[in-house]
Structures are given as C-alpha cells and as structure tokens.
UniProtKB/Swiss-Prot annotation:
The cytochrome bc1 complex contains 11 subunits: 3 respiratory subunits (MT-CYB, CYC1 and UQCRFS1), 2 core proteins (UQCRC1 and UQCRC2) and 6 low-molecular weight proteins (UQCRH/QCR6, UQCRB/QCR7, UQCRQ/QCR8, UQCR10/QCR9, UQCR11/QCR10 and a cleavage product of UQCRFS1). This cytochrome bc1 complex then forms a dimer. The chain crosses the membrane at residues 34-54, 78-99, 114-134, 179-199, 227-247, 289-309, 321-341, 348-368. It comes from Oceanodroma furcata (Fork-tailed storm-petrel). Belongs to the cytochrome b family. Heme 1 (or BL or b562) is low-potential and absorbs at about 562 nm, and heme 2 (or BH or b566) is high-potential and absorbs at about 566 nm. The gene is MT-CYB. It comes from the Eukaryota. This is Cytochrome b. A ubiquinone binds at residue 202. Heme b b562 binds at residues 84, 183. One of its GO terms (molecular function) is ubiquinol-cytochrome-c reductase activity.
Length: 380
C-alpha cells in the first residue's frame, strides 16, 4: 500500500499530528474553544494590520491624517481599521476567558504551557499598547507619555531607560517611529511563542473538565473538534463584524478624534478597557514605585499559580468553596475595570484600593487556604 503523505511527508506530518490526528480528551467543553479563537484573532490582526501598514505613515505630522485617509479614501479602509481596532478587544476577551478557564480547571499544572501562555499575554499587552499610540490622537499621545513614564520609577536607571525608550526628552517623532516598528514586529513574536505554547501543550496533552488522565479514551481532533472550532469561529466573527459595522467606536475614547497636542492634557487619561483592571491597581497606591510594582504584580502573579496549588484535586469542578472564590475574583476584576475608567476622586479611590487588596488576597492567600480546607473536609 502506498504511504499516506499526510503521515509520511515531513511538513504534513507535523500539521497532521497537531491538527488532524491529535489525540484529544472526549469530554472537553466549549471553554476549550478559546485557544483556536485566539489563533483566528492573531491571523485576523496580522492580515488587517498588514493592510493598514501599507497606508500608514509613522510620522507625527502625518500619522493622524494618514489614518483618516485610510478610512476615507482606501477601498474598505474604514472596515479594515474597524476590524483591527475591535479585533484587539475581542483578542483580549478571548485571552481573558482562556486564562480564566485554565485557572478554573487547573491547567496551570502544565507548568511550561502555562508559563509560555503568561509570556504570550505580556507580549500581547505590549503589542496592544504600542499599537494604541499609532493613530497619534490625544489619548494615544498622553497614554504613551503616562505609561512609558512609569519606568522612571525604577531607581538609578529609570530616567535613562525612559529617555532611551522615547528617543529624546519627550514622546515625539522617534517614539512614534519605533513604536510602529515594534507594533509590526511583536505579532510575529506572538506567533512564534504560540508555536512553543502548542509544542508544550502537545507534549503533555490537553487537560479536561474532570482534571483526570484521559489517555485511554482520547478521540482524534478532526472531525470532532475541528467542526466544533468552526462553530466557535462563526460565533466570534459574528459579534466582531457586527461591532465593526454598527458601532465601531463604542470601545474607543472620544479624545482620540483630536490630533495629539503636547500642550493640552485630556481631563481623564485612561488606557483601553482591557488594561483598566491593571490601571486601577496602579492608581490605588499613592506611591509611584509602589504603584508600578503592583501593576507588574497584577499580571506576573499568574506565574505563581502552579506554586500556590494546594488542592489534591486538579480542577474546581467539585470544589464549591474554591468556585465561590473564583467567581468573587471575576466580579472583583469587573469592579477594578470599572474603577479604572472613573476619575480619581471619592468614592472611587477607596473602592479601587479595596478591590486591589481583594485581588491579591484572593490569589495569594485565600485560594491556598481554601484548597487546604477542602482537602481536610474530604479527608484527603
């Protein structure tokens, strides 16, 4: 019998083992769809971004008008831009859901997969930040100024790092040029990290809602999950295109319709919605260095998840106390997101400080204690 090229050809064999004949647990739920949705988001962002880059000019005098030109004069330029801007929001929705699922079902015990995933999140955040600066509107300019300025809180070398990042003594043309270069480069870095992420995942195999080894009853990825993923893709593209066509500026900041002006500060500087939780944590500490450390810790704390797992069971499926804590954490993140969008005044300051304290308390203290308590209750 002739050898099947799908199983013998060096390249096709890799694709086959990753997407077609991949042994997959038979009981994974829709929460496992977000990985493929993230891949779709990345491909969409790279494609729309490439088309936008063809019409964009990375110069402070021309950036704003080049974006306006893309929307007015380029064939479907408005649609490409709206898909790209809102695609970023959906990218973050998917990655937050993906992380939440990993946290709920104990997927972080695949340490290498989890750690590369956290690195992917950090790279995505960096990409989104430098991308937000490119239209060179008011919020782009002041967002870049405020966020890059945080590095000046680092003792001794902080100010030097900031001036090195800016390419001068303020956010100006060199900053915009290098941010464009970085925004073009980082998505390909994300694609590379994704391959590493998948390599580690396929080494250990997927987790499942029960958190138990399912080697004995695994099923091939195609056609079962490939079809299920296509449904997920349709359900993602529907709200994305609806948003891009009907309310493209819903999640944007009105300040960004005004060209950047270093002489006029917007009344309330805030990042895009997907960074607001971290921004609220940053603002909840009245000290600059303390705020920056808390901001970094808000994401880097994810690296500690495997070390803080004290339960004898992997998932939270049969741990009601941990479930309660998990959903409290989710609610807390919504509160932080809301606080980040509010001005720095009473009562928002105290709510932000309480929510920030709760965030770290739940993750670092309450989860391990609750896990140990549940072990005792189950006589483990």
């Amino acid at each position: 019998m002739a050898p099947n090229p799908r199983k013998s050809h060096p390249l096709l064999k890799m694709i086959n083992n990753s997407l077609i004949d991949l042994p997959t647990p038979p009981n994974i739920s829709a929460w496992w769809n977000f990985g493929s949705l993230l891949a779709l988001c990345l491909m969409t962002q790279i494609l729309t971004g490439l088309l936008l880059a063809m019409h964009y000019t990375a110069d402070t005098t021309l950036a704003f008008s080049s974006v306006a030109h893309t929307c007015r004069n380029v064939q479907y330029g408005w649609l490409i831009r709206n898909m790209h801007a809102n695609g970023a929001s959906f990218f973050f929705i998917c990655i937050y859901m993906h992380i939440g699922r990993g946290f709920y079902y104990g997927s972080y015990l695949h340490k290498e997969t989890w750690n590369t995933g956290v690195l992917l999140l950090l790279t995505l955040m960096a990409t989104a930040f430098v991308g937000y600066v490119l239209p060179w509107g008011q919020m782009s300019f002041w967002g870049a100024t405020v966020i890059t300025n945080m590095f000046s809180a680092i003792p001794y070398i902080g100010q030097t790092i900031v001036e090195w990042a800016w390419g001068g003594f303020s956010v100006d043309n060199p900053t915009l040029t290098r941010f464009f270069a970085l925004h073009f480069l980082l998505p390909f870095m994300i694609a590379g990290l994704t391959l590493i992420h998948l390599t580690f995942l396929h080494e250990s195999g997927s987790n499942n809602p029960l958190g138990i080894v399912s080697n004995c009853d695994k099923i091939p990825f195609h056609p079962y999950y490939s079809l299920k993923d296509i449904l997920g893709l349709a359900l993602l593209l529907l709200p994305l295109t609806t948003m891009a066509l009907f309310s493209p500026n819903l999640l944007g900041d009105p300040e960004n319709f005004t060209p950047a002006n270093p002489l006029v500060t917007p009344p309330h500087i805030k990042p895009e919605w997907y960074f607001l939780f971290a921004y609220a944590i940053l603002r909840s500490i009245p000290n600059k260095l303390g705020g920056v450390l808390a901001l970094a810790a808000s994401v880097l704390v994810l690296f500690l998840s495997p070390l803080l797992h004290k339960s004898k069971q992997r998932t939270m499926a049969f741990r009601p106390l941990s479930q309660l804590l998990f959903w409290t954490l989710v609610a807390n993140l919504f509160i932080l997101t809301w606080i980040g969008s509010q001005p720095v005044e009473h009562p928002f300051i105290i709510i932000g400080q309480l929510a920030s304290t709760t965030y770290f308390t739940i993750l670092l203290i309450l989860f391990p204690i609750t896990s140990a308590l549940e072990n005792k209750m189950l006589n483990f």
